[in-house]
Amino acid sequence: MVQWKRLCQLHYLWALGCYMLLATVALKLSFRLKCDSDHLGLESRESQSQYCRNILYNFLKLPAKRSINCSGVTRGDQEAVLQAILNNLEVKKKREPFTDTHYLSLTRDCEHFKAERKFIQFPLSKEEVEFPIAYSMVIHEKIENFERLLRAVYAPQNIYCVHVDEKSPETFKEAVKAIISCFPNVFIASKLVRVVYASWSRVQADLNCMEDLLQSSVPWKYFLNTCGTDFPIKSNAEMVQALKMLNGRNSMESEVPPKHKETRWKYHFEVVRDTLHLTNKKKDPPPYNLTMFTGNAYIVASRDFVQHVLKNPKSQQLIEWVKDTYSPDEHLWATLQRARWMPGSVPNHPKYDISDMTSIARLVKWQGHEGDIDKGAPYAPCSGIHQRAICVYGAGDLNWMLQNHHLLANKFDPKVDDNALQCLEEYLRYKAIYGTEL
């Protein structure tokens, strides 16, 4: 009896795989015969364009797998939000993320994997084709988070460098390799480092990807760096439009530092057993008498900016100087953004300070700033949980989030609130195909 059940399961999986493969072929054939990028262009209002978008959305839609009203959640309907929160509490114990083994099995057939996971495998507009984006993705755990992030930002004209922490488990590394082997424009960084929290290694991971991305044949225009707890809140088309509006400028947090942060670069820090430690050794002043600024690890940088990070001798001197500081990613980029020799930079004057809310790089809710907006707080309390004083978003944060101009937000975790992620996935997929909100 057990053998019969296993045989039935195998036949079912084989049939499902065949169906998905045939559906993919049928979709591609349909598009070759009737649809092209002109028909998908959001500026076109022809009936043929609507027909093509309907076909595409029916095949690629990512509806939430639970009985929740994602349209209501993203619009801020309180009843829909409450239902999503209650639903998340009911199923949280049952929800188990996909494992490394799951992805190793699923990616044995790449076409089946891409079809089942509903990756968008062709450009959705000429404008997007002509404006490729480069991504650095620095990850160390939670394979499902990585795969869902990749699916959300993936477009065939873009280029993606994935840096896997050298100390990550081998099964995780193998699962990442298996996933990216299915895509010609996704690759693992040629040099991997052992990433230590708040140390130089986090910056080095991004620099390694920058070098590899510049050597690729893809003529990308802008660089975005991401981590495994990020997720986009804009479609690729919206990102392209936002990046075009920068007109060669960069967008990253860069502000005059508070006094308590100056210790981070005034003293030497060293890594001991994968932990960063403060020493009593004072550092020399920064090169070229540079004024130090603070920001965060995540940037939106032009290709010229990235080239100057790696090639300009002045940039290289600053890089060497910050290597033994605390959390250098939070002052290196911010300081380079105010350096006169850097393309797209801005002057040192405080009037040019850019906060995390003004920059488009990353939307983060800091626990210390949450509160009553009517009483002056920048944003309402987190509807999820907090991790290292940062909000891990819940469904109740989505409406606020989608009203902001940022390209990506942080942090997300399906084990905390998968409904938040599922509704965001549904929203973004609808926006990508139709250009309008869910």
Swiss-Prot record:
Its EC number is 2.4.1.102, 2.4.1.148, 2.4.1.150. It catalyses: a 3-O-[beta-D-galactosyl-(1->3)-N-acetyl-alpha-D-galactosaminyl]-L-seryl-[protein] + UDP-N-acetyl-alpha-D-glucosamine = 3-O-{beta-D-galactosyl-(1->3)-[N-acetyl-beta-D-glucosaminyl-(1->6)]-N-acetyl-alpha-D-galactosaminyl}-L-seryl-[protein] + UDP + H(+); a 3-O-[beta-D-galactosyl-(1->3)-N-acetyl-alpha-D-galactosaminyl]-L-threonyl-[protein] + UDP-N-acetyl-alpha-D-glucosamine = a 3-O-{beta-D-galactosyl-(1->3)-[N-acetyl-beta-D-glucosaminyl-(1->6)]-N-acetyl-alpha-D-galactosaminyl}-L-threonyl-[protein] + UDP + H(+); a beta-D-Gal-(1->4)-beta-D-GlcNAc-(1->3)-beta-D-Gal-(1->4)-beta-D-GlcNAc derivative + UDP-N-acetyl-alpha-D-glucosamine = a beta-D-Gal-(1->4)-beta-D-GlcNAc-(1->3)-[beta-D-GlcNAc-(1->6)]-beta-D-Gal-(1->4)-N-acetyl-beta-D-glucosaminyl derivative + UDP + H(+); 3-O-[N-acetyl-beta-D-glucosaminyl-(1->3)-N-acetyl-alpha-D-galactosaminyl]-L-seryl-[protein] + UDP-N-acetyl-alpha-D-glucosamine = 3-O-[N-acetyl-beta-D-glucosaminyl-(1->3)-[N-acetyl-beta-D-glucosaminyl-(1->6)]-N-acetyl-alpha-D-galactosaminyl]-L-seryl-[protein] + UDP + H(+). Induction: By all-trans retinoic acid (ATRA), TNF and IL13/interleukin-13. Strongly down-regulated in colorectal cancer. Glycans are attached at residue 289. Pathway: Protein modification; protein glycosylation. Keywords: Disulfide bond, Glycoprotein, Glycosyltransferase, Golgi apparatus, Membrane, Signal-anchor, Transferase, Transmembrane, Transmembrane helix. The chain crosses the membrane at residues 7-26. Primarily expressed in mucus-secreting tissues. Expressed in colon, kidney, small intestine, trachea, and stomach, where mucin is produced. Residues 1-6 are cytoplasmic. Residues 27-438 are lumenal. One of its GO terms (biological process) is intestinal absorption. Disulfide bonds join 70-227, 161-382, 182-209, 391-423. It is a single-pass type II membrane protein. GO terms for cellular component: extracellular exosome; Golgi membrane; membrane. It comes from the Eukaryota. It is found in: Golgi apparatus membrane. One of its GO terms (molecular function) is beta-1,3-galactosyl-O-glycosyl-glycoprotein beta-1,6-N-acetylglucosaminyltransferase activity. N-glycosylated. Belongs to the glycosyltransferase 14 family. Glycosyltransferase that can synthesize all known mucin beta 6 N-acetylglucosaminides. Mediates core 2 and core 4 O-glycan branching, 2 important steps in mucin-type biosynthesis. Also has I-branching enzyme activity by converting linear into branched poly-N-acetyllactosaminoglycans, leading to introduce the blood group I antigen during embryonic development. PANTHER family: BETA-1,3-GALACTOSYL-O-GLYCOSYL-GLYCOPROTEIN BETA-1,6-N-ACETYLGLUCOSAMINYLTRANSFERASE 3 (PTHR19297:SF81), GLYCOSYLTRANSFERASE 14 FAMILY MEMBER (PTHR19297). This is Beta-1,3-galactosyl-O-glycosyl-glycoprotein beta-1,6-N-acetylglucosaminyltransferase 3. It comes from Homo sapiens.
